[in-house]
């Protein structure tokens, strides 16, 4: 008989020990030390959950008034919004990254984000369930409910800690991919600028024949002007009018070429203007000599 009683006591003690889960300290995550908005929002949720887990008189009162679940709803929405915004910000910098890599990183980060959101929702739902259970007891002892809630919250905090660690890792990988994409974008810009500079150099080389044609045209015009200056004196007035028209055209065309060729054509234009002035002077001297000769005859 004593043996049976001893066996019964041992069985009961073993069952009690199996029901009581050993207290495991939850390591406080430090992922929000970098100060990103999504990490700060997550830290507010974590601190509030740690306060709820104390199940103090104030916590009990706010749980029964639905204030805790409402506050958790706001904290969850704020956290998920900040995570989404930060992810979108990193996606903008993933442009130059290969599409398959971008899709893989996005899928992994989305999965970590979904797990965290689901576990946060489960915490809120469990607290709402506790509120309903306490109200249904109608003044009876709720110690067993509080014990179960404490155990469940402890487990959920451990799961949330793993979710946070995983999300932190995925965010770090995503950020590294964004930085790599930004560096590739800068390299592409540098290559593009180098190509444009090379194109400009080639265009400068190909524009040299145009300068040579303009110079030949100027030489041709000077030859024509010299030929006009040697014509007969009775056509002097006509020659002057033609020379004036030619001068106007030459100046207009010279200005057009000067705008297109800029510094290349300016030295040649200055030379043309100088030779033109010398030619006019020669013509005027010749004309003056021809008009003074008859007046000196007896």
Curated annotation (Swiss-Prot):
Keywords: Chylomicron, Endosome, Extracellular matrix, Glycoprotein, HDL, Heparin-binding, Lipid transport, Lipid-binding, Oxidation, Phosphoprotein, Repeat, Secreted, Signal, Transport, VLDL. Transmembrane segments: none annotated. InterPro entries: ApoA_E, Apolipoprotein_A1/A4/E. Heparin binds at residues 155-158, 217-224. One of its GO terms (cellular component) is multivesicular body, internal vesicle. The keyword S-adenosyl-L-methionine does not apply. Residues 151-161 are annotated as: LDL and other lipoprotein receptors binding. Residues 95-243 are annotated as: 8 X 22 AA approximate tandem repeats. APOE is an apolipoprotein, a protein associating with lipid particles, that mainly functions in lipoprotein-mediated lipid transport between organs via the plasma and interstitial fluids. APOE is a core component of plasma lipoproteins and is involved in their production, conversion and clearance. Apolipoproteins are amphipathic molecules that interact both with lipids of the lipoprotein particle core and the aqueous environment of the plasma. This is Apolipoprotein E. The gene is APOE.
